[in-house]
């Protein structure tokens, strides 16, 4: 499979029409376990995906307690922001395809969010574990 501008353009169209204003594309070759094999026994327990974002995409501050996350910008520009448990921004990284810093590694347990700065930005995301929806306790609730 080629990962090229044709694929990116197709995903941008899908993201534009999505209520969430983003679209992901699973890059795992074996997303589902074969019949008779439990998912915990299945070899590919990672997450590898493209995620296409619009500037009005909302990604709340959250964390992943069981895995780190790698984010690399393939097209466009985003800002990755790190937060402490009190909701204070502790760092931010401007990530730009072809720029000085196209990617960042988000440590396990680090509160963070991504802000899309260019419509149709395409990021590659990788996590160590199989997809598990972030529980409500993993979203940062800021009370001021």
Language-model-detected regions and their locations in the chain:
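A short, N-terminal "cap"/entry segment at the start of jelly-roll beta-barrel domains
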Residues: 1-45, 91-96
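Conserved short histidine dyad/triad with adjacent acidic residue
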Residues: 49-66
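Short, surface-exposed charged micro-motifs
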Residues: 50, 70, 113-114
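Short beta-strand His + acidic residue motifs that chelate non-heme Fe in jelly-roll/DSBH
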Residues: 60-62, 80-82, 103-106, 112-117, ...
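Glycine- and acidic-residue-biased ligand/ion/polar-headgroup-sensing regions
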Residues: 66-86
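Double-stranded beta-helix
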Residues: 87-94, 98, 111-144
């Amino acid at each position: 499979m080629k990962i090229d501008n044709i694929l990116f353009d197709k995903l941008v169209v899908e993201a534009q029409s999505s209520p969430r204003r983003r679209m992901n594309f699973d890059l795992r070759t074996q997303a589902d376990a074969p019949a008779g094999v439990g998912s915990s026994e299945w070899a590919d327990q990672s997450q590898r995906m493209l995620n296409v974002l619009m500037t009005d995409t909302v990604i709340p501050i959250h964390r992943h307690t069981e895995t780190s996350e790698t984010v690399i910008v393939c097209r466009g520009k985003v800002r990755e922001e790190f937060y402490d448990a009190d909701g204070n921004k502790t760092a931010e990284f401007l990530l730009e395809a072809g720029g000085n810093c196209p990617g960042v590694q988000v440590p396990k347990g680090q509160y963070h969010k991504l802000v899309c700065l260019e419509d149709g930005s395409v990021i590659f995301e990788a996590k160590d574990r199989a997809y598990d929806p972030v529980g409500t306790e993993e979203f940062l609730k800021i009370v001021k």
